[in-house]
């Protein structure tokens, strides 16, 4: 062996060792299974997906949404609306996550199985686009809150102290910076996100407890407010609207729970990680905001704590919570857009890897965040709480009613048919019902439209048209030309 060969051999050995060490440190998994089921031997179990979900749903904006709900309803009605919305999300995400675990499918693949390889283009594009916008908004919000405390004029949080002068005190600059920083976490995949999620859970939980203590002592002493009994102090809203707002906080990602639930190893784990997300983590964020408004009788993005320790604790909470929400949104979006590139040619290996797609989506989201175009949460909540359940309802109807007894092979075979027309009719009918409710029955949550279309209309048409029988897709439902009949 020559000296050059020896050097090359040592280099390869060192390079392999460095890769192994970096994977252990950053928990990077080369295979994210973006376009095929996660096999049982690659499943991560409970803790890592649970930490990703917990960090994801520790969203700072949910504190303000909880505050808004309480301002519109007062206590205790505001607490009831928040709880019912979170209970709905738990059941909704749990049903989708259960089937994602069973078949090892992410959200895009579940959509393809339900709508067909061409039929799923529009719903997948809409959801992936919405969650990309949510990624951009969370990064923008992190920037605007920092500017409102330390910079110049913010969009939502008032005027800052001026510690950050000139361009350093503008929302657009920091929105772009935060979008890149937060987005880079998602580029390294589910395992790195789990590591970040652990840090977020420890940090935000500790600071949340501190917030509740501070609110119940410092703020309550100043205002004399009662957290358990208070009159509405903001824009009045109906109880149904309060529930809808609670659901709207995470109904898009609850619809996409398959991206996380597919990594679990049992049904209990699949339901468990969704329980961590909604009755616990997201509920805590909403509760803090509601608790503050019930005591203080006003809305404030810093919840009366901007002067405590120079605002450092509240700033840490919003950085960490918005950061983990950003990486979860980007991960969801990238799973969707990666699958959209496989339309018509699922067997062909494309040059765009999942990681490259994630970087592209991150760059697009960064541009949107830095442009300051997403500066109002209300339209987003209304849009996502109406659109997402239309698709989630179809997933529930498909995997729990139409194809509940099919095998994984049959379910995947059905994903290769072009269009599942009963599902398309179901989503269109759900859209019509939701539009009718928004226009003529505003006291009812439009979420019901998606559930009616997906869980009632779609199964009825599928059975009537011969696409399904006795909880199984027929040859017609799978695609006769592919089933060999």
Per-region residue spans from a language model:
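Membrane-interface loop-to-helix entry segments
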Residues: 173-215, 271-278, 381-393, 450-455
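C-terminal membrane-solvent junction of multi-pass transporters and transport-like membrane proteins
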Residues: 391-459, 464-485
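Helix-loop-helix connectors at the membrane interface of multi-pass transporters/channels
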Residues: 142-170, 329-360, 402
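Membrane-interface "cap" regions at the ends of multi-pass membrane proteins
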Residues: 2-79, 89, 232-243, 262-272, ...
